[in-house]
Amino acid sequence: MNYWLIKSEPESYSLEDFRKQKIATWDGVRNYTARNNLRAMQLNDICIFYRSVHKPAAIALCRVVREHFQDPTTDNPAWLSVELELTEIFKNEIYLTEIKAHPELQNMALLKLSRLSVQPVTPEAFEIICNWANS
């Protein structure tokens, strides 16, 4: 199993939107590295749902329920989507400022590649964030 972090701007797709839909098509990704990460996602991989821009924070978990397919928002077959199911809303949001301050999270792609919308997360970082979010 692999772990990922997916970013969303609340104006585009909020946690409330995800909660209502339960299963989301993750589309509109137009960065090659992020697209390659979508391609690498496997069934049942787990993603941290991260709210970007306003009060950026890790706020929920979701899992991959459909592996990559052509993004339905474009005719260009180079761009991909996956389907994600919301599985858990964190008890405590983990804000970017807290992640930046945590010594064991300093190597997260979130801090090094801040604009990347789909990024891998190590099992260690995933465990730290989930334990923290649910404590």
Briefly describe each language-model feature range.
Residues 50-56:
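Short, charged beta-turn/beta-strand-edge "cap" motif at the junction between a beta-strand
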Residues 1-43, 125, 133-135:
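Compositionally biased, charged N-terminal/linker segments
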